[in-house]
Swiss-Prot record:
NAD(+) binds at residues 136-137, 215-217, 241, 265-268. It comes from Corynebacterium melassecola. The keyword NAD applies. SUPFAM superfamilies: Formate/glycerate dehydrogenase catalytic domain-like (SSF52283), NAD(P)-binding Rossmann-fold domains (SSF51735). Keywords: NAD, Oxidoreductase. Its EC number is 1.-.-.-. It is an enzyme of class 1 (oxidoreductase). The active site is at 217, 246, 265 (proton donor). This is Uncharacterized protein in proB 3'region. CDD domains: 2-Hacid_dh_2. InterPro entries: D-isomer_DH_CS, D-isomer_DH_NAD-bd, NAD(P)-bd_dom_sf. Coiled coil: none annotated. Belongs to the D-isomer specific 2-hydroxyacid dehydrogenase family. The keyword NAD applies.
Amino acid sequence: MKFVMYPHLWESTTAVIEGGGHERVEDIKDADFIFFNGSAPEFPDLPENIKFVQASMAGIDALVKRGVVNEKARWANAAGLYADTVAESTIGLILAQMHMHAATRLAKSWSVRPEVENNKSWLHDNKTVAILGAGGIGVRLLEMLKPFNVKTIAVNNSGRPVEGADETFAMDKAEHVWAEADVFVLILPLTDATYQIVNAETLGKMKPSAVLVNVGRGPLINTDDLVDALNNGTIAGAALDVTDPEPLPDSHPLWEMDNVVITPHTANTNERIRALTGELTLRNIELFEAGEQMATEVDVVAGY
C-alpha cells in the first residue's frame, strides 16, 4: 500500500513500514492511508482515496473533538504501545510525590528535612491504588505495582474484571472509590462523560492524605478546583504529566506548589515509540487488506 506520513517525517517508522513492502509518497492524493503524527489542528482534509488513518497516539480524543473522525475512513490508534513507558513513568510520579521531591527541590535547603520526615509517605505501607481507565497501560501498571503489595482497584466502563486488580468496578458503580483509595491514577480517555471527572465534589470525597496522578488527559481534572484542594489540604498532593491548560503557563500556581510534581507530557517519548508504531502499522495493514478489524481499530462513534 502507499502511505503518506504527516505532518512529521519519522525516518525510523518509515523504514519499518517500507521494509514491509509499502511505499511512502509525498502527495496525500496518491496514498492509500495516512500515518498521522501531529496535533489535532494539523490534521489535513482527507481525500476520498484515503482508506484508513493510522494515528501515532494512544488516544484520538483531540481529533474527535475537532470533528475530523468520521466513517469516511477507518481509524486506528496506537493503543497498547505506551503501556511500558507510561506505566513506568506513573510509578516514578507516584513515588516522587509521596517522597516529597517537589518540596525538597523548592526548599533548596537541607532545613526541609524535618518537614519531609514528618510528612513523607510510603507506597508499600498498606496503600490502596485506584486506576481509573484500566486498559492496556493500567494492566501493565498493575504488574509494576505488585512488589509494593498495594491493594488495587480498577475502574472501567464495563465493570469486567481487570487482570491483576484486586477489585474492579464499572464507572457508574465506583462512587465509593473516591473515599477509599490513597492514590488515584487517571488513564481515562477524554470524553463528555470523563471531562473534569475530578472536580471540587470528587476531590472533597478523597482522604486528606490522598495523592492524585494524571497521565491521561489534562481536562480530566478541573484545574482550578485542584489548586484549591491542594492549597486547602483537601488532598495531600498531585503528580501531573498532563495539564489543563497545556502547556501549563510558566506563571501558573501549580509550578510553585511544594505538593505538586509536574512533568511536561513526557510519560512517553516519541523516540521510544517510533519503531513500535511502524511494527503496529504493518500489522494493521495486514488485517486491513484481509478485510478484518485492525488490531487497534477505533470505534468512530465512541471515539476510542
